[in-house]
Amino acid sequence: MRELGYVAVALVAAVSSPAAAQSPRELLVSAAFSARDKPTALARIDAALKGADAEIARNPKNREAQLQRAVAIGYRGKLKRSRGDVLAARRAFEALVAANPRDAEAQMALAGWHLGAVIELGPLVARTALGARKSHGLQALDRAVALGGGRAFFPGYASLNRILLDPADIGRARALAEAAVKGRATALIDRVMQRQAGALLQALRGGNGKSAARAAKGLLPFGRLPD
């Protein structure tokens, strides 16, 4: 079923090409943005999941490993159309947010889960099939941006979601994208989202929200993989 094939999870990794020494975080973004086909992406996701599991075995309280494990499960659920993985990712994101509500990355991951499902399936189907709610996603999205400390990642990812949710909301999406371009790039992921936000701005400046939304879809994780 179509609803089994979608879950959006926040982009919480840094871009580089795959290598044995890569962290789970790096492997996941490589899968999301560098892989040119689904088998390659899944292989990188599997490697990231194994790496996160190994880190958790060494230290069960490792928040970074817990987050990347949840992201990996969500990505796998999206690509394999596994409702079980999709729901498992949600539970993991919720647990991370409950443990630390001020964790901006966990808030963004949960926001992406809800909003991605709504964008892909529509509000009714997303809620019925997966329990995803636009209101929950927007609340987590706004919290993530507020808690993000001016880092580019958070407004950049928010801008993509906002224009996809409402192609008429050009002003808000543009303001977020501009904030991302001007934001602090303390990690590679911030530079990645500055690039994505810059690409979105080009479309937004044309004043065509629907065109900008189409561009945004291709800028999200796995947005350029063939169907």
Question: What does each of the following model-derived ranges do?
Answer:
Residues 62, 103, 150-151, 187:
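Residue-level recognition of tetratricopeptide repeat
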Residues 117-118, 150-154:
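Generic helix N-cap/helix-start motif at coil->alpha-helix transitions
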